[in-house]
């Protein structure tokens, strides 16, 4: 093979490994110890992956083609190669790992230990390099600011959000929210944090510049939240309402309540086709909703007790 051909071939391989034509959904099935992989182009399950015991949280790393799964009962993190959909490593954490988040540079994995009340920061390139921080009571949802400088932690039993410097791993401030904050999302510019308050039946919108917040009532026992990429709409799963609430962020009002499967938990917005994916714990499925019409498109059978807590959508890379 000629040098030019070798270089061209190598470039094609590199492009194929770093660009994903379709978006993929990674759904943890806590009762089956598996992860269902859904291709959003045809909304079909294309793989079923055996992971650790009691999988709950998900974080995706597109550039490195990795998916991280927290196994709350197995006290571990399963690491999946998204190119092959095979588990390539199992990282023992101890405790009870639940929430996960990846830094924007994809160099650090953050893990919320639900029962031991601490956050674990793991160097992805050297997984034995780990730092610990006590952030609050029963930490659940995690998310990192787009600039990578701040980690936000929903402390369920402290009823607050801990804001942590990722450089020092020190808490810089706390923001009180509703009762039992759990799922988190953030606007693409990092200016607003969205917090689900389970026992308050509400979502808090926190201005990350000054800490001021605004609360919007939603359905019964909300759990997780996902914002549209243009920052105009917010979607909240209501576990005991078997529905999601669609919120207009300009008017700060619920504009639609959309029926889903039983006990919806994890929720994610697919950017290209503008579809919403909701994991239903109660009937082992994922509901797919058209964001342009707020209508249910289909329900996809997955596995026992589907949760998909966190950022479980591997968005298409163009």
Regions found by a protein language model. Give the residues of each.
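Predominantly soluble domains enriched in secretory-pathway, periplasmic, or organellar proteins
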Residues: 5, 11-318
